[in-house]
Amino acid sequence: MAADGFSVTDRLLHRLAFSSAGLQQALADIEDRLYAKRIGAVEVTRPVFVTSLPRSGTTLLTEVIGSVPEFAAHTYREMPFLACPLLWHQISGPFRRESMERERAHGDGMKVSFDSVEAFEEALWHAFWPSRYRGDRIIPWEAGTAGESPEFDAFFRNHLRKLILLRRGGNAEPSRYLSKNNGNIARTISLQEMFPDGIILVPFRDPVDHVGSLLHQHRNFTAIHRREPFAREYMRDIGHFDFGANLKPVNFDGWLDAAGPVDPDRGDFWLRYWCATFEYLLHHRTANMSFLSYERCCERPRLALTAIASVVRLDAGREQLLTHADRFRAPRAYDAQALGLDPVVLRRAHQIHARLLDASVV
């Protein structure tokens, strides 16, 4: 959501909530005690994590999957006290505003409201793992990393219970957690270790079109952050390091060091990042990870949605997914020459893309 959509009170609350990681964790501890019995009765089974580089269709896929009542996910309603959703829901109830859709800051036609799914869990990872967010980059979570912080493992699992509990009521009885978080590409291995029955869904796009979209959004958010300082502050606090002044790419296999100085205002930066990301994910593909071609979703959406329903192991709601078939539309195409892409790196990208297509569930 754009920074101009926040009142003075909204900004003050945001700054209070993010003034100290300890404040939110202390409130979460209070919440644990207040709702202990109800939280303890909730099981976390078969969570679904939708993740990839941004601009790959993660938002649309999560909205579609999230339309099925068995899922619970983060929404803007949990802001700014992300770590204590039950407590904040109770406190903010009398002041809750009507949910009205508006185009998100990306300017891509996607609508958001207070009830839209968003990647707020990244702020929790950031609070517990600050050493992974190192200067201008993010360091991936490797095998065994999850066990290094049993405190976080317990906190995070408990947090998922809270969200599931929060979404219950009326005709909704969600039993599973749904995550949309591009930052999770840095920790797919850890997520499998933490949730052996979890499902990781990774959409991908043609590298040229994807790189063009990434470059466009980086320039878009660079301008937004320059124009609206609170927008930069807000996105930094919630862990959105995808674009603009807050950019922190994931340093898969040390690609940032191997590439040398590369300007993120150039297409080659994003092409190298694309290659590093998907080579890493293919090499470290876990048993519970599925790749999904976004272009094929647009070409045959009903077939794709049927495959997605099987991948995420829906208990019910398959017909609900199919009602969203007309939302999949071919994205804007880009030209490699106009983007000034290195032909050697581009050949490598096309080879990686061919492997992804072979692995795609559609």
Predicted regions: what is each one?
Residues 55:
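Walker A (P-loop) phosphate-binding loop of P-loop NTPases
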Residues 51-52, 180:
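The Walker A (P-loop) glycine that initiates the GxxxxGKT/S ATP-binding motif of P-loop NTPases
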Residues 180-182, 191-216:
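Conserved phosphate-donor/acceptor-positioning beta-strand/loop module used by diverse small-molecule
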Residues 59-72:
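A conserved segment at the C-terminal end of the G1
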Residues 176-180, 291-293:
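Short catalytic-loop micro-motif centered on adjacent basic/acidic residues
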Residues 77-177, 245-251:
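PAPS-dependent sulfation machinery
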